[in-house]
A protein has these predicted regions:
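Conserved active-site "lid/cap" helical segment
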Residues: 2-76, 80, 160-169, 179, ...
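Conserved catalytic cysteine-centered active-site region
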Residues: 29, 61-115, 149-156, 228-255, ...
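N-terminal extracellular/periplasmic Venus flytrap/periplasmic-binding protein-like
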Residues: 15-17, 28, 32, 37, ...
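Active-site pocket-lining segment
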Residues: 59, 156, 192-195, 283-352
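Flexible glycine-/small-residue-enriched beta->alpha junction loops
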Residues: 111-164
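Condensing-enzyme catalytic core mediating Claisen C-C bond formation in acyl metabolism
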Residues: 2-31, 230-297, 301, 308, ...
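Active-site-proximal alpha-helical scaffold in enzymes
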Residues: 91-123, 162-192, 262-269, 334, ...
Length: 399
């Protein structure tokens, strides 16, 4: 007997600040601990919810090994003090892992298999490098010349996009500058305060002469990446790092980062049962494949599909969070789809704010949901390119 599809509502959404990898806030903080911070904070937003009603936790993680291996979703659930009856599964669609976690959680509710779910994402690029610790790509991949692009470094794919879509170095640097300017302006205006959960971190320094270790604890509540001193002149001085005569630099690429985000999703039945207040309805999701060597164009395919599934038009979108993996691919997407620049990344993007890979989808979803409420807008979208040639997009409606 078929079940009627029901709506899935986001009733709570939060994230940690985003720290710079290796030398930043969370360089010594494990990714499972970051996840715990996000889980505990998001559940604190819905105190009337019985944790035993949570069916499962789905957590995105792009490189699920080392400190974020061994099913970090289940580990996070246990460390966060959730009932042992709450399951946990870690999912990996690289940069779209967190967004895919939201889609999977929503679908469980929409088909009637769950009343309450948690979707999350966590990533520590300080502790687990983007390439992983011991990657091993099948040698069979190189038997066909058409498959070679699957092994390209992300920066090289951005160079290819810049060449094919004719995105100049000057345009990329200008886009990067605007990302920082928008992020700084949003921070100064307190625009991120609703979505960010402050996190305590402990810094330890050692006296080399005495061996004494001094620990200092502080609370961080802002993303660490935005740089007030960013300028076109400074960006123009940076050398290209992926191609000798290229245009992609560290300055017009996303930052490697650490962070986590989490959302609570509930059915209409659970909303009424526990007295929850919906923030948004999950509307649609699409993931599409593209040639791996130009993976940055993924949103060009995913965005129209997500809109089609939702029965909406591009102009219906009021707020678009387009992950800035690289300025080159961001501009290629914006120009090809003719996205309204005024609606895209109004508070900056990954070039300024950072990109903790598998956590980014959950983090950007928290951003768009709270932004829709702050500005009384209706529809928002989160979209990103995905390594090895994919794109993903998800649409949310303010309730």
């Amino acid at each position: 007997m078929s079940k009627q599809v029901q709506d899935a509502y986001i009733v709570a959404a939060t994230r940690t600040p985003i720290g710079r990898s290796h030398r930043g806030y969370f360089r010594n903080t494990r990714p499972d601990d970051l996840l715990v911070k996000a889980l505990q904070a998001v559940l604190a937003q819905v105190p009337s919810l019985d944790p035993k009603a949570i069916e499962d936790i789905i957590c995105g993680c792009a490189i699920p090994e080392g400190p974020q291996g061994l099913n970090v979703a289940r580990i996070g659930a246990v460390l966060a003090g959730l009932p042992t009856s709450v399951g946990g599964i870690t999912v990996n669609r690289f940069c779209a892992s967190g967004l895919s976690a939201i889609q999977m959680a929503a679908d469980r509710i929409r088909v009637g298999e769950a009343e309450v779910m948690i979707a999350a994402g966590t990533e520590s690029m300080s502790m687990v490098p983007m390439s992983g610790n011991s990657p091993s790509l099948s040698p069979n991949m190189f038997l066909n010349d058409e498959n070679v692009g699957i092994a390209y470094g992300m920066g090289l794919t951005a160079e290819k996009v810049a060449q094919q879509w004719k995105v100049s170095r000057e345009a990329q640097d200008q886009f990067a500058l605007e990302s920082h300017l928008k992020a700084i302006k949003a921070q100064q205006a307190g625009e991120f305060s609703m979505e960010i959960t402050p996190v305590e971190v402990t810094d330890r320094t050692a006296n080399l002469e005495t061996g004494e270790v001094i620990a200092k604890t502080r609370t961080v509540s802002l993303d660490e990446g935005p740089r007030p001193d960013t300028s076109l002149e400074g960006l123009a001085k940076l050398k290209t790092v992926f191609a000798a005569r290229g245009s992609v630099t560290a300055g017009n690429s996303s930052q490697t980062s650490d962070g986590a985000g989490a959302l609570v999703l509930a059915s209409e039945k659970a909303v009424k049962q526990f007295g929850l207040k919906p923030l948004a309805r999950f509307v649609s999701y699409a993931a599409k494949g593209v040639p791996p060597e130009i993976m940055g164009i993924g949103p060009i395919e995913a965005i129209p599909a997500a809109l089609r599934y939702a029965g909406l038009k591009q102009e219906d979108m009021d707020w678009i969070e387009l992950n800035e993996a690289f300025a080159a691919q961001s501009l290629a997407v914006i120009n090809t789809l003719k996205l309204d620049p005024a609606k895209v990344n109004r508070m900056g993007g990954a070039i300024a704010l950072g990109h903790p890979l598998g956590a980014t989808g959950a983090i950007r979803a928290a951003t768009v949901i709270h932004a829709l409420h702050r500005h009384q807008l209706k529809y928002g979208m989160v979209t990103m390119c995905v390594g090895m040639g994919q794109g993903a997009a998800g649409i949310f409606e303010r309730v």
